[in-house]
Amino acid sequence: MTILPKKKPPPPPDPEANGERSGSGAPDSHSRSGARPRSSPPPRWAYPGNPSSAAERHTQQVSPPPGSATSGGAGPLGDGALGSCCCCNGAGAGGCCSGPGHSKRRRQVLSAGPGATGNCPDTDDGAGNNSEDEYETAAQTQHLDPDTAEQQELCFEKTLSDKKGFIIKQMKEDGACLFRAVADQVYGDQDMHEVVRKHCMDYLMKNADYFSNYVTEDFTTYINRKRKNNCHGNHIEMQAMAEMYNRPVEVYQYGTEPINTFHGIQKNEDEPIRVSYHRNIHYNSVVNPNKATIGVGLGLPSFKPGYAEQSLMKSAIRTSEESWIEQQMLEDKKRATDWEATNEAIEEQVARESYLQWLRDQEKQARQPRKASATCSSATAAACSGLEEWSGRSPRQRSTAGSPEHPDLHAELCMKPPSPGAPLILGKPPSPCAPGPSNQMSTGADRATSPLVSLYPALECRAIMQHMSPTAFGLKDWDNDEILASVLAASQQEYLDTMKKSTLRRESSPDHS
């Protein structure tokens, strides 16, 4: 009979190995496509300028960390977590403590380690802070001189503005500064911080299987505490918001290059969310004024950053151009109207001056016929008296009066006075240069003293007046009385010519006898 050896009992299960197998096993059912690589938590950055030793920093913390371990490399929560370095306890391994990056598995292992002194339960003393990194930060905040701190802030703002062109927008210091800074760059209004916080906490709860590995306290308690509006934000929330808005989150701290960058799941060309970290307790928004970022990451279809501002600017420019064109057209119309009014005024002035000049000329011409008509009246009266004398004389006297020795008197006797009010129309007087017996017999003195010579200017003026339009004198048309007077004058002239011929015939007959 063969005796079989005793079967060795199976080795006790290693909690660390089980944890590693559970962490590296099948993918979680809650994980999404493009899942994050499971890696050890990232180390945290030590705040520069803190020369205290590891033991001193350990004694200064309000709530001691639950253990320490050397980090295995940079994780998905960024190139490095914010906060000051927390040294190892007991064994003094020379690595940096990863703070809130501790997983539950590592807490269990470290609590059972040789240098561990037991778990220190979390207290509510620092409920307003984040996880263990801000417990430490709150205890290790440097007490700088106010003047030095203000000078440092001013230098930081000036350097960032000169080299990068960025502007630091101050956020309200009420515990929600991180969410205010993100809301300012996503929504354009820091008062939307409550919406950003709610979305961030909901995202953390939906991905609790992943983010719970980087929280040192109960994850539900952590989320409930972070839902309070006065609770500070942490690098875990930054990573969640980077994935939620699919925009990188860059953190600047007294330098022109970001000290930490949190990336989303998918890489794109969207403008990152930039925040600045001040005095280890406050976040502000860092804005690029030359590039629009509001609305990026909200999932709006066909959204173009800054398109609304460009549309408003184009509309404002178009409105301004239209208003300017209308103003110029109005000015041109005003100038054209003034020019037309000036021309009309000039034309009216010229017409008025011309009319006044014409009235003066007419007045002068009217004065000259009056004098001539007075002379004509006296000459007519003399002719009438001569006719009366001629009619009262004897034939001998009449023959004597008609002799060639008195030609002027004979011409005056031949004139018959016109009817009063009727115009006197006579033929044009003979030219002085024309040959004829009358011109040879008359002298210059006789023509000057003859009443017929004085009638010539009046007759010429009257002929000119008859050829003029009646509207020049304010009349619509010539009256019939004028025409009748002209006919009567012509009849009188024929009568005088007949009398003259008969007289000459009578005078010539006695001479022949």
Curated annotation (Swiss-Prot):
Pfam entry (one): OTU
Residue positions of the active site: 174, 177, 282
Region His-loop, residue ranges: 277-282
Catalytic activity: Thiol-dependent hydrolysis of ester, thioester, amide, peptide and isopeptide bonds formed by the C-terminal Gly of ubiquitin (a 76-residue protein attached to proteins as an intracellular targeting signal)
EC class of the enzyme, as a word: hydrolase
PROSITE patterns membership: OTU
Variable-loop: region residues: 226-236
Gene3D superfamilies per the UniProt record, alphabetical: 3.90.70.80
Molecular function terms from GO: cysteine-type deubiquitinase activity; K63-linked deubiquitinase activity
Region of interest: Disordered: 1-75, 99-136, 387-446
Entry's family note: Belongs to the peptidase C85 family.
Family matches, as PANTHER family: OTU DOMAIN CONTAINING PROTEIN, OTU DOMAIN-CONTAINING PROTEIN 5
Function: Deubiquitinating enzyme that may function as negative regulator of the innate immune system. Has peptidase activity towards 'Lys-48'- and 'Lys-63'-linked polyubiquitin chains. Can also cleave 'Lys-11'-linked ubiquitin chains (in vitro).
Name of this protein: OTU domain-containing protein 5-A
Organism: Xenopus laevis
